[in-house]
């Protein structure tokens, strides 16, 4: 209601963001998605989920929805390094992410992918290579996140016991790394997010104290300073 008053005529995408939003019986999912689409001024859906939490039946249904309205399925890929995925107990492999993305693309559904930079055991080179590999898949949207240590999680306990296992990036280091990623990925992928922000009361580290819009402004400036642009060094096959 607040945004409806502030932005007259604004249309919206209903974002099923938290948790795995395809992990339920099809009829329950159908009810939730249709309920969202019945809301005034909602013109589409963004559905976040895991690569191992989608079935063919669910994808077939979403494909039908995508012929009626805008739909994007976002997969939490997080890393292309299977050893890192095992370390953080993701419960899926990169091959499973590839398969889910391809099955989704075959149905004509728009696809987004999420990557986390700074997971335990992942090197800078591995993260950069992983971003390129993910963008070589038939995705349209990429969202990037820095690793954040959040209170009350298993990773927070591990961090407090063994901080040496973690390589948390400073703001400047992360900024320059994102510039490197932008230069190497497919030029037609939409970058919709560069950083994430956990509430201050839950965040253990890193504490940058910067807003998303501030990061974007500094990123644009750093790209100009370094003479970089998206896809400048891209040599991949793309959308295979």
Regions found by a protein language model. Give the residues of each.
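Active-site-flanking structural segment that lines cofactor/substrate pockets
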Residues: 1-3
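Conserved SAM/AdoMet-binding glycine-rich loop
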Residues: 6-92, 99-100, 106
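Active-site-proximal loop/turn and secondary-structure-junction residues that shape catalytic pockets
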Residues: 18-22, 51-53, 77-81, 115-121, ...
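Structural recognition of alpha->loop->beta junctions
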Residues: 36-42, 129-144, 216-230
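Short, hinge-like loop/turn segments at secondary-structure boundaries
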Residues: 63-65, 92, 130-132, 160-163, ...
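Glycine-rich tight-turn/loop motif centered on a GG-T
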Residues: 83-94, 159-168
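Conserved C-terminal portion of the radical SAM core fold
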Residues: 95-155, 172-195
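Auxiliary Fe-S-binding modules of radical SAM enzymes
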Residues: 141, 149-240
């Amino acid at each position: 209601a607040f945004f409806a008053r502030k932005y007259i005529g604004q249309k919206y995408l209903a974002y099923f963001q938290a948790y795995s939003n395809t992990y339920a019986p099809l009829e329950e999912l159908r009810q939730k998605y249709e309920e969202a689409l019945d809301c005034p001024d909602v013109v589409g859906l963004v559905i976040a989920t895991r690569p191992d939490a989608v079935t063919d039946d669910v994808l077939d249904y979403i494909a039908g929805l995508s012929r009626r309205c805008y739909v994007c399925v976002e997969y939490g890929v997080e890393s292309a390094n299977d050893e890192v995925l095992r370390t953080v107990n993701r419960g899926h492999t990169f091959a499973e992410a590839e398969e889910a993305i391809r099955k989704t693309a075959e149905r004509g559904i728009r696809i987004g992918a999420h990557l986390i930079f700074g997971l335990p055991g992942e090197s800078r080179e591995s993260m950069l290579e992983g971003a390129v590999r993910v963008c070589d898949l038939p995705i349209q949207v990429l969202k990037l996140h820095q690793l954040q240590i959040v209170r009350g999680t298993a990773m927070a306990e591990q961090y407090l016991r063994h901080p040496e296992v973690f390589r948390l990036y400073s703001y400047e280091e992360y900024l320059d790394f994102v510039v490197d990623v932008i230069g190497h990925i497919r030029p037609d992928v939409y970058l919709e997010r560069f950083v994430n922000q956990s509430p201050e009361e839950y965040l253990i580290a890193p504490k940058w104290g910067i807003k998303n819009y501030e990061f974007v402004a500094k990123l644009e400036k750093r790209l100009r300073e370094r003479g970089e642009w998206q896809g400048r060094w891209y040599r991949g096959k793309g959308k295979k």
